[in-house]
Amino acid sequence: MRYLWLFLIHTIGLFATDKTLDIIKTIQKLPKIEVRYSIDNDANYALKLHEVLANDLKTSQHFDVSQNKDQGAINYAELKDKKVHLVALVSVAVENGNKISRLKLYDVDTGTLKKTFDYPIVSLDLYPFAAHNMAIVVNDYLKAPSIAWMKRLIVFSKYIGPGITNIALADYTMRYQKEIIKNNRLNIFPKWANAEQTEFYYTQYGERTPMILKYNIQKATHENIASSQGMAVVSSVSSDGSKILMSLAPDGQPDVYLYDTHKKTKTKITRYPGIDVSGVFLEDDKSMAFVSDRSGYPNIYMKKLGLKESAEQLLYEGRSNESIDAYKDSIVYVSRENLNEFGKTVFNLNLITLNSKYIRRLTVNGSNQMPRFSTDGRNIMYIKKTPQEYAMGLILLDYNQSFLFPLKNVKIQAFDW
């Protein structure tokens, strides 16, 4: 048994029906880790790594983190007196004339160096990903619940000017940002096409009709998927990438279509003389949830993947429920609520599951939009706006914790994680 707290995390997780684990903090102290950095070779770069790594470990909720400079030889006796369990030393090394980011992980209890992890410095601005990978190494050493989501890319559409949006990539903290599609057009609604994050779909408004394109990041190539008058948006991709759900409006009113990426065929799966949009896969890709105005206002419905299958209303609370995402049998959605004490309309995130009528509120103020599950369903990212801030939000469902990463000089139209 490495640490009792690890057992507690897994055990409580089995019985916590609403996935809140604040109780852990009162049961067992987290293992203490001291994050250090070396000033050799490139002190500024090492300091950046040190800052991101420390913040990643804090964000994970698995460590009690302290920070320090390199103290030379590891004084295990002194560290034991301080109740420190681990030391993570980040540095920049030079091998064969090339700089590399290096992590050394020391176990104070055993008095030994346990891990050495090298990450090539291909480009200086990629340092957040080096730090995220280091955090994953430290976390995996303790066999804590996975934080592999930290190394995933965010793809987003950013406003440039009237009628112009570019597609860019970022890390989850938004420290790293790089524009990859810039053509003075409206490029919107990006959606990852595969788990490897090598391709994504997006909508481009050209001279005539909106088009759904698939872009390969490595090859910088495009594939034309579909086009439609008025609306053409990919809203969900199946777990194996073989099928996608699209909102198209060839006859004026939008409906949800199922597209087979192998056969290159699309099938209409909703038929209603109103609005059916934003389909997201549910129940291991066997059904979908979607937004419809069948109730006279936007609400969440569910149906199997066939045109003749009936639709079932999932929510009977609220008068405007929209902007959804799903993971297995869980659905996160945006609910428009009454004006708050400041006269502002509030848009909050709520979480439901198909096997429970319980609605879990995830936010309490401001405008919270575009919720997106992580690939393991344990976390949600979203855009938060208040009079005081504009930020990318992160909710750790297992720990009932949230974080905000300020969005400076960037306005996001849509994103995927």
Swiss-Prot record:
Compartments, record wording: Periplasm
Gene Ontology CC? periplasmic space
Q: What is its main location?
A: periplasm
Q: Which Pfam families match?
A: PD40
The protein's superkingdom reads Bacteria
Q: Which GO terms describe its biological process?
A: cell division; protein import
Signal peptide from the UniProt entry: 1-16
**Keyword Membrane belongs to the record:** no
For this protein, the record's Gene3D superfamilies field holds:
TolB, C-terminal domain, TolB, N-terminal domain
InterPro entries tied to this protein: 6-blade_b-propeller_TolB-like (IPR011042), PD40 (IPR011659), Tol-Pal_TolB (IPR014167)
**Keyword annotations of the record:** Cell cycle, Cell division, Periplasm, Signal
Assembly and binders: The Tol-Pal system is composed of five core proteins: the inner membrane proteins TolA, TolQ and TolR, the periplasmic protein TolB and the outer membrane protein Pal. They form a network linking the inner and outer membranes and the peptidoglycan layer.
Record function comment: Part of the Tol-Pal system, which plays a role in outer membrane invagination during cell division and is important for maintaining outer membrane integrity.
Q: Which family does the UniProt entry place this protein in?
A: Belongs to the TolB family.
Q: What is this protein called?
A: Tol-Pal system protein TolB
